[in-house]
Amino acid sequence: LFRSNGTFDITVGQLIDLWDFKADTPKLPETSAIAGALTSIGYRGITLNDSTISFSNPNTIIDLGAVAKGYIADKIKEYLIEQRVDSAIINLGGNVLCVGKKNSDDFTIGITDPKGSSDILKLKINDQSVVTSGIYQRYFEVEGKYYHHILNPKTGYSYDNGLASVTIISNHSVDGDALSTVCFTLGKEQGLALVNQLAGIEAVFIDTNNALYYSDHAKDYVIQ
């Protein structure tokens, strides 16, 4: 949260509820409703105690969609290891976590082409996580304009920063889950700068023209 400077904020629950990306006939939320939801957003209004959480704004609602799958994947991996499983893939849709290796070889994990259904890139992964956040995962079009599920907590609308997806390679899926969204919201330059400061984290950014950008050591994972 603090590294994103508010571009990523878990207190967007009211805003998330306004946008229905699963509707058969999607429609834009009312401008007044978005304005109202924005007043409930602000992670600095969260107070954590030993066993309780409170909000300075009683209308604030937390949404943990950006970390939930990663947390669950990590817990599944912990369980499998406890059961002495030494090779497995946990795939929660956009979140892939590998346990060990595949028959002594690395697992091959694809990154989806944002403009198609095939893979734009393949990675060799050993006992690590690969998480992607992209504008093609949940979206709709209204009057020719594209709206996706990664929402800007400052405007109430989808981010429009030239990025199509961000993929994070990490040891823990919860880290990759959060960082894929955080880095998307920061944009290419700031997002890559953040990743390059973090030990054990690599990233692949894809823009809306399908150009690829890599963190310092991400190409070490790419299958040529």
Label each region the model flagged.
Residues 2-224:
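Mature catalytic core of soluble alpha/beta enzymes
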